[in-house]
């Protein structure tokens, strides 16, 4: 696979399932526009999007309940969505799957550090030389529960630093903890 030329210099919203995804809805209701919207996993069953990133094998949703509340919405989406849905392996039961260009992205970035779906989407943006990334719903830890945090924040922040270094503008939802965006100035 080669980079997608039409993405070069474009503004992309990447929307995950964390609480700050509501900031995406607010942005849209206030007429913010994006050249493309990329959905992470089950968010694709809720919002209009151009691409889906799901780095789990489709069998996780088709054959098990391992994804909990995401299972049913992903099951329907995978069987009907025409793509592109970037994933780690193809499955003939899902017409829209495209194998994520892992070799190409790793070779381009000279880096193997990818451990969650959002990081793969950010790395894909870097590889495609987008002009701006606006992130919503990538919240990895939560102010109301100091003892819980999802894995993957450091990896996403690492890839965002690589994007910034490459001249890509990075904007984070105001209520997200990513890059400490939601930390009050007095803290």
List each model region and its residues.
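Metal-ion/cofactor- or nucleotide/acyl-coenzyme-handling active-site neighborhoods
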Residues: 1-187
């Amino acid at each position: 696979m080669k980079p997608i030329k039409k993405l070069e210099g474009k503004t992309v919203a990447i929307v995950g399932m964390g609480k700050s995804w509501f900031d995406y809805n607010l942005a849209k209701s206030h007429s913010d526009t994006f050249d493309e919207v990329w959905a992470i996993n089950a968010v694709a069953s809720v919002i209009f999007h151009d691409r889906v990133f799901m780095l789990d094998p489709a069998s996780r949703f088709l054959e098990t309940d391992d994804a909990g509340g995401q299972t049913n919405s992903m099951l329907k989406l995978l069987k009907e969505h025409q793509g592109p849905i970037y994933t780690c392996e193809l499955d003939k039961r899902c017409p829209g799957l495209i194998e994520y260009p892992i070799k190409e992205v790793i070779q381009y970035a000279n880096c193997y550090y990818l451990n969650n779906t959002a990081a793969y989407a950010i790395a894909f943006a870097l590889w495609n030389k987008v002009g701006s990334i606006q992130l919503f719903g990538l919240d990895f830890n939560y102010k109301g529960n100091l003892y819980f945090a999802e894995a993957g924040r450091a990896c996403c922040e690492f890839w965002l630093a690589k994007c910034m270094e490459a001249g890509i503008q990075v904007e984070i939802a105001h209520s997200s903890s990513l890059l400490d965006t939601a930390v009050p100035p007095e803290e």
